[in-house]
Amino acid sequence: MNRALGGNDENAMLMYFGYSYPEYIASNYFDANNHIFHTLLVNLMSSWFGEENALAIRFPTFVFGIACLWMIYLTALELFHSRKIANTALLIAAVNPVHIHYSQTARGYSLVMFFSIAVIYYSLKLLQSSKKRKEIIPLAICGFLSVYVLPTNVFFLFGLAIWLATILLVPSFLEEYGIPKEERRNKAIYFFGAAAFIALTSFLAYSPVLEEMQETARAHQLLTLDTQTGSAINLTTSIIKKIFQGPLLWFVPFLIAGAFFGSRIHRPRLLLLLTIYFVPLIITLITGIGGYPRNYLFNLPLLALFLAAGFFKAGDWIEKRTGLHGEKNRVAWWIAAFYATISLGIVLFEYYPSIQVPDPTFYQKNVRQMTSSNDLLLISDPKNFLYARITARKTLLQIIQDNKLTGVKAILPNSANIEEYEIFTTKGPFPIFNGLPNLQDLHSISLDEERKMISITGNESISVLSKDFEADSQWQKVSGNGEFLKLDTHVLFGKHSLEVRASSEQRMVLGAPVRGNFPIVKPSLIVLTWASKKFDRKTIAYHPILIAQAEFNGTIQTFQMKTGKINDGINIQIKENPSSSETYHWFVRSAIGILPPGRYTFKIMLNCDAGQRILYDGLRLFFIELA
C-alpha cells in the first residue's frame, strides 16, 4: 500500500482533481476519474499528511475495503441465515485479487463496493423488520454516497428498486419474507422516502456539474443499442472475468449453484442476483452511458455471497453421492480452501509483482537537490509529474514572485532526448526543440534508474516585464468590445490584477506594449508565466499571446511567437490572500517558445470570448539563451 503513487489512474485523479481545492473538486467533472466523494477524502488526507504520502492518500480506500468485508459477512447472515456461508463469503472477498487491488489503490471502487452491499444489507433489514425504522437513515446515506462516488451506481440502485418493488407487489414473495400484507404500504413508504432522499441529495450534489457530466459521458466509453450491442454483450461476461480473474473463472459454476441454495429455490433471493446484475446492463444498453467493467464492481460483494453458498450446495451434493454425508461440510471447506489458495497465488505471484515500481524517494530527493529555487522545470511524461510536482510548483511560484529566472531544466526518461519534448499549443503537441543545433550534446544528470535531468539553458535571463505589469502597462482594445479594470481586491502577485470583461455581443482582444528593444544574439528560450481566474466552467482562459516585431533582410516584420504550455496535467491552483469579499482560487500556468537571434520589440495580447470575464495576474516574460 506504500508503493509509489501514480498507477491505475491514480496519476490522473491526483493531477486533475486530488491536489486541487474542495470547491474545485465538487464543481468540476471534465474527466471521469473524479469520483467526487472519494476525491474529497483524498484531498483531505493529502492536506493533513502531505501530497506524496502514499499511505495517507490510499487510507480511505483501505478503510472502506475492510469495512466492505464486514458488511459482506452481515449481509450473508441476512440473506442466507447461515454463519458458515457468511464466514466463507468473507474469506472469498478477503482473498479476491480485485478486492485487494481496489482496497489499496487510490480510486473510488472500494467505496462503491462498500456502499452497494451496505444498501442491500439495510434494505434487507428494513424489509424483514416489523418495527424498526432506524435502517432508513443508513440506507439513504449509503445510497447517496454510492452515487456521489460513481454516478453510474444509480443503475445499481434502479436494479435494487425493481427488486424491492417486486417483493412488495408479489404476495408469494411477501410470504417468503414473512411480511404481513397490511405492512406492505408502510414498507413502500419507507423505501420511497429513502429513494426520494437519495434522488434529491444526488441531484443537489451533482447540480454544479450535471452538464459537464453529460459531456464527459458522451466522450467516454459508450454502449448504445444501435451501434454497440455486441459490446454490451461482451460487458456481461467481462464483469465476471474482472471479478474472477484467471483460474478463478473455474469457480463460476459454483456461483450458479449458489443461486439455487437450499432445499428449494428461494425465488426472491435468486431474483436479487439477477436484477442487480442485469438491470444495470440493460440501462447501459438503452441509455448509451456505461463504462469499464470496474464500474460494475457493485456486483462483487453479492457474487461473493452466492459463490459461498454454491460451495456448500455443491459440497452437500457431492457428500450425498460419495458416502461422505457424515463428514458435514468437509467438501465445501475443501473447495473454499482451494479457492483461497488459487486467489492468494494470483495475488502473491501475479498481482504484487505487477505493481512493483521503483522507490520514488531517490528521484524526489534528486529533483529537489538539483533544482535551484528559480529554475523552471519541464517534465516530459505525466508519469513523472507526481514526485516532481511540489518542486515544480514551488520554483514556478518563486520565479513569478521574484520576477527572476535562473535556468530551465528538463526531466526526461533515460531513453529520450530533448528533441522529443513537446509543448501543448492550440493546434496540438509540438516538438519545440526538434532541429535545433547542439542540443544532442547536452550533459545529463541521472535522477534514478529511469529518469534524467538536462539543463537546456544558461544561468542568465532577461526579465522583460515589471512585477506589476498588469497595472503598470498601457492596455488598449485591439478589437471587439468590452472593458478592462485594474483590481486591488483580488490579487495573487504584486498589488493589482487585471480584469478583462468582454461584451455579450463581441469577443475582446487587449494589447499592451512591452517597454524596450531586445537584441538577441543567440537562439534563446521564451518563458511566459501567468495566473488566471475564470468564472464560468465553459470559459476558455486563453493563454497570453506574444507579438514580436523585428527586422529581417531590411524588412520589418510583425508576427506571433509560437509558444505552448508546459507540464500539461499539473494543475497548479493557488488561493489568494483573503480579502473583504470572496476569496478566489487561481490557476498558475507557464509556456515556452523559441526566439531566434535578432532585435525585437514586443506586445502582450489577451483574448476574452463574448460575455465572459477573466482575471489575469502574475504576467512574467523572460528570455534566456539556450545552452
Q: Where in this protein do the model-derived segments appear?
A:
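Catalytic lumenal/periplasmic loop and adjoining terminal transmembrane helix
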Residues: 152, 203, 207, 333-453
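Transmembrane alpha-helix segments characteristic
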Residues: 87, 93-94, 143, 190-199, ...
